Swiss-Prot record:
Pfam families cross-referenced by the UniProt entry: MRP-S34
InterPro entries according to UniProt: Ribosomal_mS34
Tissue: Widely expressed (at protein liver).
Location of this chain's protein in the cell: Mitochondrion
Role this protein plays: Required for mitochondrial translation, plays a role in maintaining the stability of the small ribosomal subunit and the 12S rRNA that are required for mitoribosome formation.
Organism, scientific name: Mus musculus (Mouse)
Protein name (record): Small ribosomal subunit protein mS34
Keywords: Mitochondrion, Ribonucleoprotein, Ribosomal protein
Family to which this protein belongs: Belongs to the mitochondrion-specific ribosomal protein mS34 family.
Subunit note: Component of the mitochondrial ribosome small subunit (28S) which comprises a 12S rRNA and about 30 distinct proteins.
GO BP of this protein: mitochondrial translation
Domain of life: Eukaryota
Entry keyword annotation includes Ion transport: no
UniProt GO cellular component terms: mitochondrial inner membrane; mitochondrial small ribosomal subunit; mitochondrion
Length: 218
């Protein structure tokens, strides 16, 4: 007997999608989540107060969307960086904007999300991704006439330290051992820092015990 074909529950699926859309609409927007009372330095939505270290930056610096709202096309293709990056790193650190989605319910369009390609300490990523911490008050726009000088960077060759001199006592012991064995080489003894994988002294015994426990395959 052929099995009866079960039709999908179209009404239940439609109801699930409607509930998901309602939940999405009821979620607070960025302009509500990250709204800030500049007198008390608290966020009205959560009631949390900003940390003391952020108070000075809130009054002097700007959020990312505050900068982009003043530019045509919200600054697509421009470079933005952060004050903390300028202080901490000598290498160029910046985002190149590829996409901006402002929150159109915000009064000055100064909230939203942005995407870009990150270059951190002179190394650029291959793909664009969403920019994090856009609500922080430490974003700065790189002027167009300074972009070429800001992005100029020559990577320095990495100096890998493969060996170091032995401590004085060990060095004296090695030289004495050479003299005892009749070795006349004058090469300075150096300690190799490269990792070499060495098997433990009981490795063969462990392998033999493991083979016995496993038994012979049938």
């Amino acid at each position: 007997m052929a099995r009866k074909k079960v039709r999908p529950r179209l009404i239940a699926e439609l109801a699930r999608r409607v509930r998901a859309l309602r939940e999405q609409r009821n979620q607070p927007r960025d302009s509500q989540l990250y709204a800030l009372d500049y007198e008390t330095l608290t966020r009205p939505h959560s009631g949390r107060r900003l940390p003391v270290r952020a108070w000075a930056d809130v009054r002097r610096e700007s959020r990312l969307l505050q900068l982009l709202a003043r530019l045509p096309l919200f600054g697509l293709g421009r470079l933005v960086t952060r004050k903390s990056w300028l202080w901490q790193h000598d290498e160029p650190c910046y985002w190149r904007l590829t996409r901006v989605r402002p929150d159109y319910t915000a009064q000055n369009l100064d909230h939203g999300r942005a995407w870009g390609i990150l270059t951190f300490k002179g190394k650029s990523e291959d793909t664009a991704r969403e920019i994090e911490q856009v609500m922080y008050h430490d974003w700065r726009l790189v002027p167009k006439h300074e972009e070429e000088a800001f992005t100029a960077f020559t990577a320095k060759p990495e100096d890998r330290l493969n060996s170091v001199p032995y401590p004085p006592l060990l060095r004296a012991m090695i030289l004495a051992e050479r003299q005892k064995n009749g070795d006349t080489s004058v090469q300075e003894p150096l300690l190799n820092l490269e990792r070499t994988r060495m098997r433990p002294w009981d490795y063969p015994a462990k392998q033999e015990t493991k083979g016995r426990a496993k038994g012979t395959p049938v």
